Amino acid sequence: MKKISFFFLALMFSATGFSQQQLTADQLVKNQLPANFRNNLPVFVKWLDEDNVILRMAVAPDTIVTNYVLDIPAGKFTKATKEQLAGTLPPFKSAYVRGGKLFYKAGTSEKQVTFDAAEVKNPVFSPDSQYIAFTKANDLYTYHIATGKESRLTFDGTFTTLNGFASWVYWEEIFGRATRFRAFWWSPDSKTIAYMRFDESMVPMFPIYNSDGQNGSLEETRYPKAGAKNPEVKVGFVGPTGGNTIWADFNAKDDQYFGWPVWRKDGSSLLVQWINRGQDSLKVYDVNPTNGSKKLMYEENQKTWVDLEDGAGGRFHFLEKQDAFILASDKTGWNHLYLHKNDGTLMNPITSGNYSVLDIELIDEVGGWIYFIAKGKESSARTDFYKVRFDGKQLTRLTFGDYNHSAIRLSPAGFYFVTTHSNASTPSRMTLVNNQGKIVRELGDSKGAAMDKYQLAKTELIRIKSADGLFELPALVTWPLNFVPGKKYPMLVSMYGGPNAGTVTDSWNWSANRQLYAQEGLIQVAFDHRASGHFGKAGVNYMHRNLGYWEMQDYMQMARWFIKNGQADSTRICITGFSYGGYISCYALTYGADVFTHAMAGGSVVDWRLYDSHYTEKFMDTPQENPEGYKSSNVLTHIDKYKGVLQIVHGTMDDNVHMQNSLQLISALQDRGKQFEFMLYPGGRHGWGGEKGIHFNNLKTRFVYQHLLKKEIPAGLVK
């Protein structure tokens, strides 16, 4: 734990110098900073090749920002041409949906493909660009570009039978929202389409009310809540012109989930990820598309859970020059890379240790290196870039300094990379580095020449020991400007709080609003608990069957630490978050109400029985299997402990965390005569923008000034 004495605090906050000016409230409110206070970093556009990269920037003596090509060996900038920006992939082809109809474009020639009333979704070219596959009315179709023929591949699509179009819980929790419900996959040889068929008829329907118009309307979604029936899923194979579907050898009646499947590079088989409903036994099968037979290729079991969602197939990386693949797994308590033969046999671990591999950026089979991004090897609050041999030897850090390297852009063959890096006290910089870790060129510094003339609030990363003494928990603290040791300040804690979803990084994050709050005398804290990912899967496992408990133990310990040190006013301790962060905020003013006095909760889960099956049961098992866990994690269980001031906010059409959660909390508070603040955003989903987004920001600002700062809001701050 990093201990801070009154003497050190006095020294720390007096070291800024008497000659520095203070940014005015008006400058911060309007975000109109002095000249040369901040510089815009170059914007990475793309690599042209190993020696040339396009950056959007201003190159002296020109002050106009435009696209430049940096010739790395020559060290010279030239303005990028249209051809360089456009790329080298003529003739350009695209398939897109406009007004629900499918259009195909080659060069400048556009053609409408579909004309019926059914809305087309997710057009995808075959790898040989001869076909476009898409769904409409919950059936799968193809369009043959050369002949203009449309082929219908499935014929049983209904409101509850979906072919090639994912059921809601798969889209939200397994495949990811970026997939846009797509549930079909071309084989590499363009001869087969694998797809999933979802039967939702047994899944409970959840109604969402739309208040627009004279009579309003209902939007109904098949939404499986914890312990409820899931959709039945089949995996099938069909040719691009139709014919009988070959079904994979799985029993659709089993209580199971399927992950994002991955074709082998030769199209000979499809790797299908299967997991039981309890989500503690992952099996990967090689499925033959010609007859549907399956062969177990990989199996992983954990006492808590195995993550099925993997960024749309990111668990596997097949090699080109040998019959092997790289698999990512957190089975040891940390996410690492493993080299397997194509039959699934483990050859060797590639990485190991108390850190987590986040992404593979390049597999260089010729040079014999794997380039990857990892978190936690240097510090749990930093990410860095590394390379390692296939046998796990010669692990080399390529990034540098005590910085968080937040954006890595590697050249196509891995000779160079561009990194954007900073820490809590150092503004962001952009640097060009080679694959030996040597800095080649500084590309930009966001710190302007005038920044040092101004007194800024100090932000630092500290560690707070957990109450059980097992963890050094990270907190990013922005202290009040002109901090006075011994004076107690109100404190605002911002967090998300979900499993393996930490928000604390040792990085620079300029915010005019944060500087204004610091001038007003507010301690601002971002804090991550033991299960936020800083301590690997081993730390996240604490949440198993017990959501809310360990998170709140750590949040309360953090708040008590500031109170005990005489820095925080125990009567003004506020916590705020959205979604899972909203849940924690509500839990803080019930279970944790002896420590927290105020909370702003948005889009909150209140009772985990009201959230979806896949996410909830991964951590909690079903309500039938874990009744005590669901009871203790329920905000309503602790409602009689409620005290303080709670602001509850929800979008009326939230299809993820239903407004039902907030309404049940409100009902319980009203039944007990408890006071609270409440705001609805009509039509709002799980988040909202536009004028309602501005209103939401103003709402939170008013809360901070009224309840924490207890002063008038500066003119112009509320828009």
Model-predicted segments: where are they?
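Short loop/turn segments that connect beta-strands within beta-propeller blades
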Residues: 72-73, 106-109, 145-148, 239-243, ...
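Non-catalytic accessory segments flanking enzyme active sites
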Residues: 41-46, 51-61, 67, 77-81, ...
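Serine-hydrolase catalytic core recognition
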Residues: 205, 260, 406-719
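Asp-box/WD-like beta-propeller blade repeats and closely related beta-sheet repeat scaffolds
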Residues: 99-141, 147-183
